[in-house]
Amino acid sequence: MSDPIVLLHAFPVDSRMWDGVRPALGERMITPDLPGFGSAPPVDEPDLGLAAAAVLDHLDRLGIERAIVGGCSMGGYVAMALLRVAPARVSGLVLVNTKASADTEEARRNRFAMAARAESAGIGWLADEMLTTLLGRTTLEKRPEVEVTLRELIAGQKPAAVAWAQRAMAGRPDSFDVLRGAGAELPALIVRGAEDALIPRAEADLMAGALPRSTVVELAGAGHLAPLEIPAEFAAAVSRWP
């Protein structure tokens, strides 16, 4: 596909997580910051639909009517929220280390607790708490530069954005209806890191089942942030598709 490709970042980082992918995908890439992260202004209501609306506004300003829309983790949730409200503008999906299912009650409680902690204590603790779940064991053992980059990305975010995102993700709906509604016609690439400690392989398989034109790629040696951990391999998977 030669369409522009929108890649939406994971939590709790910003669009710089895609910098290593840019040399391979080049000018096709559009990587906006989601509300409150990086240079993006915040929104008040904790709703990923508002993040999707912000992405659509960004595409409008660029004069782009249709694009491949993708994202990693939280970015994948926003991509599916965008597909829900504007399916005609999505020519393909790239879903990376993400899932279409809603949170469990336990996961929601954990998100609300993290939001409250970020608001009361800042986010100086966040990198230490999340590092071993965000990065795969191979990265933790053999790619110290990725850990340094991730710590810098997390430290650069605002506590209010962290709190907003956690509450917004807690409130997101199940998106399998959206995938099934678009699936017969929509090409999709589903990518997961083989060492992802947060989202199991079964979630990728469930999304693939809802998207008949999907391709599933598992990247060895990567965890939950595969595009940051092994950007060349991720870019190659995108370039080979569909």
Predicted regions and their residues:
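Short beta-strand element of the alpha/beta-hydrolase
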Residues: 3-10
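Catalytic histidine-centered segment of alpha/beta-hydrolase-like enzymes
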Residues: 219-235
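Active-site glycine-rich loops that stabilize anionic/oxyanionic intermediates
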Residues: 10-13, 73
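Conserved alpha/beta-hydrolase catalytic His-Asp/Glu region
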Residues: 103-107, 121-182
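Conserved serine/cysteine hydrolase catalytic core
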Residues: 156-209, 218-220
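Active-site loop/oxyanion-hole signature of alpha/beta-hydrolase fold enzymes
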Residues: 16-23, 28-70, 81-86, 236
